[in-house]
Amino acid sequence: MSISQLSQSFGNHLILGISGTSLNDDDKRALNELKPIGVIFFAKNFLDGVPYPVWLEKFKTLIDEVRQYSERDSIFTTLDHEGGRVVRTPLPITRFPYAYLLQSHAYEVAKATALELKSLGINVSWSPVADIFSNPQNPIIGSRAFGNTPQTASEGAREYYRGLREEGILGSAKHFPGHGDTSTDSHLELPILNLSREDLRNRELIPFQTLIQLQIPLIMTAHILFPQIDPEVPATLSKIILNDILRKELGFEGVIVSDDLDMKAVSEIFMQSGTVARAFHAGCDLFIVSRNINSSSLERTYKIAEDFSASLNNGSLDAGVVEAARERVEKLLRITPQYPVSTLDKETLVKNAELGISCCL
């Protein structure tokens, strides 16, 4: 297999960000050369301040062009869409409140959210958050979690995922093995959590266990160092955490996806040769490169793809490990609906807005 083919084969494991509301030349080149199996959208990909039909048609064109240039009819079209401040879409898509406020409404909110996501052509929501709001000083999770105990976090995440699943949206539990007790933001630096494996079993892992029992198809890693468990690398690169704990101990058989590789917690280490190989060997199947952070660049994305190619060529990356990861991803893609973009009726939007208000009363 040539270097070019190898770079394209990395696309089988890549969820890539797009630069704006339409494809620029860099986007077209990356989609055509890397052929990512999925894309992740952000607020920058939606026209704002214009009528609903206008921005929706523009977004439809964007998704159509992504498929055209990547030469993929079936792709993962993904969105961070938790509610609260983690909402990327313009109005009139409903602004549901934070997970922590949903309480008994989690199931119906997720069903309403899924209906709206399908209308946007989205098939994967990077939710529910399975972290526990256990540290009041947490700058990044906080009220994004469904509760401050293993029980309340589990119940909310379970009901939310049930709602997504029933309406045909793939969910992803995050951030494994738990980001709720940190006091730093992994977008900005590498958090360190001095928890033992037993600590995780007694608290952090419980919501993930609940979602695994419901056969959630995706679990997203946390860019966090757990020195008592694996002092060498963050969870995204840890075979102990992803293989020994997530795969073997918890029995997860689905797709393991990295959090964004552009985040400061891991951005530098992924510029080092051999890091992608280590992530695959640890257990990662899919990698998100958002191109949505100040330090992001397309050159970084290509460097990661080139490291993948070089590692396969020199034998430091086991081709069998890559093939097993590819099979897991392809198996999931085969059952992932490809939704057309469509306009929601006013009655549905008003009903969903009223539901959002009722969560806060």
Pin down the residues of each PLM region.
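Preference for extracellular/luminal or secreted protein segments
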Residues: M1-I37, K248, S267-L361
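Mobile, glycine- and charge-enriched loop segments
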Residues: S2-G17, R158-Y160, E167-L170, K174-F176, ...
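Short, well-ordered coil/turn segments that N-cap beta-strands
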Residues: F10-N12, I37, E71-I75, G121-N123, ...
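Generic hydrophobic/aromatic pocket-lining and core-packing "Φ" positions
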Residues: K28, A114, A157, Y161, ...
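Enzymes and membrane/adaptor proteins characterized by extended Gly/Ser/Thr/Asp/Glu-rich
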Residues: E33-A153, H175, G180-L193, A222-P234, ...
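Alpha-helix-loop-beta-strand connector modules within alpha/beta enzyme cores
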Residues: L62-T77, G147-L170, R203, A235-V257
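Phosphate/pyrophosphate-binding betaalpha-module
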Residues: T152, G156-P177, S183-S186, S196-L218
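Oxyanion-binding "anion nests"
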Residues: L211-P231, G254
